[in-house]
Amino acid sequence: MEKEEKSNLIYDKDPGYVWDNKNECEGAAEETYQELNYEPSISADKLTWTPTRLAKTVFNTYEDDDDFNVLCYFTDWSQYDPRIINKEIRDTGGRSADILRLNTPDGRPFKRLIYSFGGLIGDKKYSADGNASIAVRLGVATDPDDAIANHKGKTIPVDPDGAVLASINCGFTKWEAGDANERYNQEKAKGLLGGFRLLHEADKELEFSLSIGGWSMSGLFSEIAKDEILRTNFVEGIKDFFQRFPMFSHLDIDWEYPGSIGAGNPNSPDDGANFAILIQQITDAKISNLKGISIASSADPAKIDAANIPALMDAGVTGINLMTYDFFTLGDGKLSHHTNIYRDPSDVYSKYSIDDAVTHLIDEKKVDPKAIFIGYAGYTRNAKNATITTSIPSEEALKGTYTDANQTLGSFEYSVLEWTDIICHYMDFEKGEGRNGYKLVHDKVAKADYLYSEATKVFISLDTPRSVRDKGRYVKDKGLGGLFIWSGDQDNGILTNAAHEGLKRRIKNKVIDMTPFYLDSDEELPTYTEPAEPQCEACNIK
């Protein structure tokens, strides 16, 4: 696991974290690798537990005097790493992402931070008691019975400790006693919401949004949307949160998925129509500090249709955060990209693309392009026992298969590596070459990259600075609203820098020169309106 000692992107060993004037986790990542016998050149089925702190923070800042925005989902579990406070723990770990990394000089890397996620009282699919005990801890309900009887459908943070009590990686240097209900407000909060407050105090123009739901917590949406009492409770819960945290000005509803199957959530053909009623009720509430409502939408055209997006826009939705990732997940034995811009329609291996989804929204649903935001990913999708039938090295369209969907290499969950893992163990962007036997391959048809090792037979589909810059250029060429990252706690800056540079923004404060990371000598890649290179006719690239 050799690394360039003078790298501008990564430390040569885990620097640890200073807590209560002590650093008891310096070198913890390396101790974890040793404990688990993790070796990137041969490991195909292990979790690495690689923390974000191994990556150096290199966010540049850029002029943002155009009509595009770059947004950031930031997760409420990203601050944790038990190795920081217990030096006996080395066989597991956490992301250890410091929210104050985003407090950059001379501007901000993101227009808006999106707190992810608020849960729902009464969601017994997520929590056996429907988050009732959490509602009591936060002072929203007097007891569990009251929570379910009178507050079902309201949104609350589902981890009070991480949301308003934690200190580590949230901008606070020591533990202070306090109950969650006492700190569940902007003035007194610690935790991630307290960290958001610190960022707000440093930059009054930085926007904040609350995202409700997500993959794991969408189980109650269908019931809420169809029930007048629960809709009212839902709106009252939003009011309560925005009163407690007036720095928030935007709302994001991440229902996965209205009218379609998500994580086994209840759904109905009436979800789309009911969703529009729910949005209208939020709009009619006229919450004083609520300036915009976005939805997180699947990039699958069938799910877009079921969500009733034109009616949602009419009811008050101002932005669509198109989840243009996870196109590849394990299941059918065929390799494909997980966040590609284009797709060859004749390719039976790939099902989705950014361009397919954007075109469907604009041409079929008549959505204003400025309301559409596309996502870039700080994580990968992987497969093992993979065989690539495209020749390597090559810039041809990806074709390949895999035969094992079990326990594939990942950082904190199987088959998913996070950005710090990539730059530490699998790709050296400063040298422009793979690490530990992996090779980076560019698919010119899809405008996407992947890593592959002949030794481990592991396939890694990922975003790179090159692919994210292409996404920025796509946004600019199509006149979309902008881009967002899932998730900002995974990126050390070079993916987000690439998004800004794809939008052709002028740099204000340079922390790092991005030029080498694009892995080409052509500073101006071909535009999509007038390609300067041969394109696959089947891809409908115009």
From Swiss-Prot:
Superkingdom, taxonomy of origin: Bacteria
Keyword Transcription regulation: no
Record note on disruption phenotype: Cells with a disrupted yenA1-yenA2-chi2-yenB-yenC1-yenC2 locus are no longer pathogenic in C.zealandica larvae; chi1 was not tested.
Gene this chain is encoded by: chi1
GO cellular component terms, A-Z: extracellular region
pH dependence: Optimum pH is 6.0, in the intact toxin complex optimum pH is pH 4.0 to pH 8.0.
Enzyme active site: E256
Protein name as annotated: Chitinase 1
Family matches, as InterPro entries: Chitinase_II/V-like_cat, Chitinase_insertion_sf, Glyco_hydro18_cat, Glycoside_hydrolase_SF, Glycosyl_Hydrlase_18
Binding site for chitin: Q186, E187, G213, G214, W215, S216, Y257, M323, T324, Y325, D326, W486
PROSITE patterns: GH18_2
Subunit (UniProt): Semipurified toxin complex consists of at least YenA1-YenA2-YenB-YenC1-YenC2-Chi1-Chi2. The Yen-TC:K9 subcomplex is about 26 nm tall and 22 nm in diameter with 5-fold symmetry and 5 copies of YenA1, YenA2, Chi1 and Chi2; the chitinase subunits may be solvent accessible on the exterior the complex. The Yen-TC:K9 subcomplex has no insecticidal activity. The native complex with additional YenB, YenC1 and YenC2 subunits is 16 nm taller and is insecticidal; the toxicity-conferring subunits are present at about 1 copy each.
SMART domains: Glyco_18
Subcellular location as annotated: Secreted
EC number of this enzyme: 3.2.1.14
Family: Belongs to the glycosyl hydrolase 18 family.
